[in-house]
Amino acid sequence: MPEILKIKPTRMELLKLKRRVKLAERGHKLLKEKQDALIMEFFTIYDEALSLRRELIKKMEEAFEALRRAQVDVGSLRLKEISIGVKPNEEIEIRTRNIMGVRVPLIEVPELKRKASDRGYAFISTTSTVDVAAEKFEEVLELAIRLAEVEESLKRLGKEIEKTKRRVNALEYIIIPRMKNTIKFIEQHLDEMERENFFRLKRVKAILEARQSM
C-alpha cells in the first residue's frame, strides 16, 4: 500500500478526507491557472527585455561614437571641464505594481533629455558634438533605467513561478495522491469490518437458531 495519512479509519474521517480532497483539487486548479498566467506574463516581459537590451546596446554604441567625436572636436581636457559643470539628473521614484499577486518595481523617471542650457554647462563654450554626445547618453540612461525595471520584474516573477510550481507539484504528486490512497485504505478497511460484522452476525444467528431447534 502506498504512503497514507495517519488518521483513524472511520466513516467520519473518510467524509472529512473526501472534502479535503475536493478542496485540494480546487486549490491545485487555481494554482495551475495562476502558474500558467505568470508564465505568459513572464515571457511577454522577457520579449520586452530582449528588445530593450538590443536597443540599449545600439544606443550605447551611438553614444560612445558621439563621445569620441566630441573628444576629437574639443579635446579630452575641455570635455572633462564641461562634464564637471553638468547638473545631476532629477531623482527617480521607485514604486511597485501588482502582477498576479507579485509586487514588481514601477520606476517613475523624470524627463532625462534636456536642453543644453538645462545641463548646466551653457556658460562654457561648447560645440554641437558635445550636445549630441550628452543627448545620446541621456537616451542610454532612459533605456538602462527601463531595462533595470523590466529585469527586476522578470526576477521576481521567476521566483513566484518557481514557488507556485513547487506548490502545484506538491499537491499533484504528494498531497492529493496521499489523501486518495488514504481514502482507498479507509474504504477497504471499512468494507473488511463490514464483512467481518456480517459473518459474525450470521454465525450468531446460526447459533441462536441451533439452540432454538433443540
UniProtKB/Swiss-Prot annotation:
It is a peripheral membrane protein. The keyword Ion transport applies. GO terms for molecular function: ATP binding; proton-transporting ATP synthase activity, rotational mechanism; proton-transporting ATPase activity, rotational mechanism. It is found in: Cell membrane. It holds the Pfam family ATP-synt_D. GO terms for biological process: proton motive force-driven plasma membrane ATP synthesis. Keywords: ATP synthesis, Cell membrane, Hydrogen ion transport, Ion transport, Membrane, Transport. Disulfide bonds: none annotated. The keyword Transcription regulation does not apply. One of its GO terms (cellular component) is plasma membrane. Its main location: membrane. Belongs to the V-ATPase D subunit family. Component of the A-type ATP synthase that produces ATP from ADP in the presence of a proton gradient across the membrane. Has multiple subunits with at least A(3), B(3), C, D, E, F, H, I and proteolipid K(x). NCBIfam families: PRK00373.1-4 (NF001545), V_ATPase_subD (TIGR00309). This is A-type ATP synthase subunit D.
